[in-house]
Amino acid sequence: MDLLWLGYDGLSVRYADVKAVLFYRPTLDGRIVRAYGHVPANVRAVVVTTDGAFWPSSWRPDQLRQRWALWRGGG
Protein backbone atom coordinates (compact mmCIF):
# COMPACT_ATOMS: atom_id res chain seq x y z
CA MET A 1 0.00 0.00 0.00
CA ASP A 2 1.47 3.33 -1.01
CA LEU A 3 1.24 5.84 1.83
CA LEU A 4 1.92 9.55 1.89
CA TRP A 5 3.48 10.46 5.23
CA LEU A 6 2.23 13.83 6.44
CA GLY A 7 5.11 14.69 8.72
CA TYR A 8 3.59 13.72 12.06
CA ASP A 9 4.12 10.43 13.91
CA GLY A 10 1.57 7.89 12.81
CA LEU A 11 -0.16 10.17 10.30
CA SER A 12 -0.21 8.90 6.74
CA VAL A 13 -2.87 8.69 4.06
CA ARG A 14 -3.12 6.43 1.05
CA TYR A 15 -2.02 8.20 -2.12
CA ALA A 16 -5.12 6.81 -3.84
CA ASP A 17 -7.31 8.61 -1.28
CA VAL A 18 -5.78 12.07 -1.82
CA LYS A 19 -8.24 14.43 -3.47
CA ALA A 20 -6.47 17.79 -2.98
CA VAL A 21 -3.53 19.50 -1.27
CA LEU A 22 -4.31 22.92 0.18
CA PHE A 23 -2.26 25.67 1.74
CA TYR A 24 -2.93 25.76 5.48
CA ARG A 25 -5.19 28.54 6.69
CA PRO A 26 -6.56 28.94 10.23
CA THR A 27 -10.08 28.83 8.77
CA LEU A 28 -9.47 25.09 8.19
CA ASP A 29 -8.80 24.39 11.88
CA GLY A 30 -12.32 23.09 12.58
CA ARG A 31 -12.08 20.55 9.78
CA ILE A 32 -8.61 19.46 10.92
CA VAL A 33 -9.89 18.98 14.48
CA ARG A 34 -12.77 16.81 13.21
CA ALA A 35 -10.33 14.52 11.36
CA TYR A 36 -7.27 14.54 13.63
CA GLY A 37 -8.54 15.67 17.04
CA HIS A 38 -6.39 18.80 17.27
CA VAL A 39 -4.32 21.17 15.18
CA PRO A 40 -0.65 20.21 15.60
CA ALA A 41 2.23 22.67 15.56
CA ASN A 42 3.87 23.71 12.30
CA VAL A 43 0.99 22.91 9.94
CA ARG A 44 1.93 24.06 6.43
CA ALA A 45 -0.56 22.17 4.28
CA VAL A 46 -3.83 20.28 4.49
CA VAL A 47 -4.51 17.07 2.59
CA VAL A 48 -8.14 16.46 1.67
CA THR A 49 -9.09 12.82 1.18
CA THR A 50 -11.91 11.25 -0.81
CA ASP A 51 -13.96 10.75 2.36
CA GLY A 52 -13.94 14.52 2.98
CA ALA A 53 -11.41 14.48 5.84
CA PHE A 54 -8.91 17.35 6.18
CA TRP A 55 -5.53 16.09 7.45
CA PRO A 56 -2.71 18.38 8.62
CA SER A 57 0.80 18.16 7.22
CA SER A 58 4.08 19.74 8.26
CA TRP A 59 5.29 19.45 4.64
CA ARG A 60 4.98 22.39 2.25
CA PRO A 61 2.13 22.06 -0.26
CA ASP A 62 4.57 21.98 -3.20
CA GLN A 63 6.46 19.07 -1.61
CA LEU A 64 3.25 17.09 -1.12
CA ARG A 65 2.02 17.85 -4.64
CA GLN A 66 5.33 16.73 -6.12
CA ARG A 67 5.23 13.40 -4.27
CA TRP A 68 1.57 12.90 -5.21
CA ALA A 69 2.34 13.67 -8.88
CA LEU A 70 5.22 11.18 -8.88
CA TRP A 71 2.92 8.50 -7.46
CA ARG A 72 0.22 9.23 -10.05
CA GLY A 73 2.82 9.03 -12.80
CA GLY A 74 4.00 5.64 -11.62
CA GLY A 75 7.09 6.78 -9.76
What residue spans do the PLM features occupy?
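Short, compositionally biased strand/turn segments
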Residues: M1-D9
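Acidic, Ser/Thr- and proline-rich intrinsically disordered linker/docking segments
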Residues: D9-G75
